[in-house]
């Protein structure tokens, strides 16, 4: 189905909305310093697409439940669930605004404060959601294909700039790491976690029960672009530079020119595509705030949208805080909470399974709360800084390594098992002898 009927969006419009909402945040924010880089992360990305494909089936079955949270979960449960998703709207919107505030002064307009950039961005997005879901569907129908084609063209133009030596260096430095693969896997799951809002949207899609292939196609398209960029960035910039840049795609855009020097600043065109996608994503979040508020019985949707816009602007003003804490929020709060909410509501909607839903949700909560966030390391296995001292005398050099007092550092009050000193001393006439010792 290509066109919408009865004020509902078509499958094609749904697919293009997914591209517009996810493409720029993914390309800008998933690579770089302390993010998903390297071969292990690439393996994790590919693995994450498999459970996401099955998750789409669950989301479609959850659509009737989320259309009226107050009815399916009860007044209290419905409102708490609605507030949980509203917090995600605020955090995600604040993060996108903070990214916009950093990109625009660097790439497009100088001398404009981040606060004013965020203000005008929110104002534009508030104006853009007045058409409701049909209006957003028409916007996606017109511009979604252009954005996707532009990003693919940009990647193709960057391929000739790649160097095989850079990829060989990355492959030579690669060591299999289960932890890094898991980080890439779970990081991709967290990035796609906004797909969990689809049940609020699918009620406005024509024949949503058959929209699974469309949503899956969107996930696979985005996943393919993600993995392609994970290879293209180190091939063009070098792996060492990628892991140091905050937004490594920005220097990549600088070299993506058409043959013949058609424009002096062709990177501005690519940046325009990315900024449009970020604004569309922000507008979608504001639109979803209205859908969630009305479905959860929180009050008037328009009022909540206005409140969400103000709070998003306030969160974006924190700048560094939201940029550093949003990933932690996704990994440790939103994704586990999303699974708990969906499992609980799905089983609660089946009256004969209500008791089972409470039990399973309780087990999940206990597993998350008592499991050490799935990444705890025993104090004895943690890495501690060593104190280094060098003494010079007529006999040569004396290098001393001082280890911390583990019982005092960890607060466990354990006695040392061997009772030996925790200082290692190495003597030599010069540093070469000490290194060989």
Regions found by a protein language model. Give the residues of each.
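Membrane helical hairpin/interfacial module
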Residues: 26-123, 429-437
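Membrane-interface interhelical connector segments
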Residues: 236-266
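Membrane-interface loop-to-helix entry segments
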Residues: 115, 128-158, 328-342
């Amino acid at each position: 189905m290509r066109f919408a009927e009865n004020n509902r969006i078509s499958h094609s419009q749904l697919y293009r909305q997914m591209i517009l909402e996810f493409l720029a945040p993914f390309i800008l924010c998933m690579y770089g310093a302390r993010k998903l880089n390297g071969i292990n992360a690439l393996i994790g990305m590919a693995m994450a697409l498999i459970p996401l494909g099955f998750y789409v089936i669950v989301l479609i079955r959850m659509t009737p439940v989320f259309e009226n949270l107050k009815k399916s979960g009860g007044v209290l449960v419905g409102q708490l669930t609605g507030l949980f998703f509203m917090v995600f709207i605020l955090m995600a919107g604040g993060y996108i605004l903070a990214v916009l505030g950093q990109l625009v002064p660097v790439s497009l307009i100088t001398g404009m404060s981040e606060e004013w950039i965020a203000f005008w961005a929110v104002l534009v997005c508030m104006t853009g959601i007045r058409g409701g879901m049909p209006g957003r569907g028409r916007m996606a129908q017109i511009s979604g294909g252009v954005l996707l084609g532009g990003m693919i063209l940009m990647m193709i133009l960057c391929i000739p700039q790649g160097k095989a030596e850079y990829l060989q260096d990355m492959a030579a430095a690669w060591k299999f790491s289960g932890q890094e693969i898991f980080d890439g896997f779970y990081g991709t799951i967290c990035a796609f976690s906004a797909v969990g809002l689809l049940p609020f949207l699918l009620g406005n899609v024509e024949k949503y029960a058959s929209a699974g292939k469309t949503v899956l196609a969107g996930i696979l398209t985005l996943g393919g672009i993600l993995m392609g960029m994970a290879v293209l960035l180190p091939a063009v910039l070098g792996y060492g530079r990628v892991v140091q840049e905050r937004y490594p795609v920005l220097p990549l855009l600088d070299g993506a020119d058409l043959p013949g020097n058609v424009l002096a600043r062709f990177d501005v065109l690519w940046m325009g595509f990315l900024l449009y996608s970020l604004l569309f994503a922000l507008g979608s979040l504001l639109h979803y705030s209205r859908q969630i508020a009305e479905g959860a019985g929180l009050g008037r949707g328009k009022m909540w949208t206005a409140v969400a816009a103000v709070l998003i602007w306030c969160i974006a003003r924190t700048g560094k805080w939201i940029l550093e804490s949003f990933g932690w929020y996704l990994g440790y709060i939103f994704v586990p909470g999303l699974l708990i909410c969906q499992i609980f509501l799905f089983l609660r909607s089946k009256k004969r399974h209500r008791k089972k839903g409470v039990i399973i949700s309780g087990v999940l909560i206990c597993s998350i709360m008592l499991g050490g966030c799935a990444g705890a390391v025993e104090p004895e296995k943690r890495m501690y800084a060593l104190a280094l001292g060098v003494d010079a005398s007529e006999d040569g050099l004396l290098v001393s390594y001082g280890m911390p007092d583990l019982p005092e550092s960890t607060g466990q009050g354990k006695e040392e098992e061997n009772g030996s000193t925790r200082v290692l001393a190495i003597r030599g006439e010069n540093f070469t002898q000490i290194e060989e010792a």
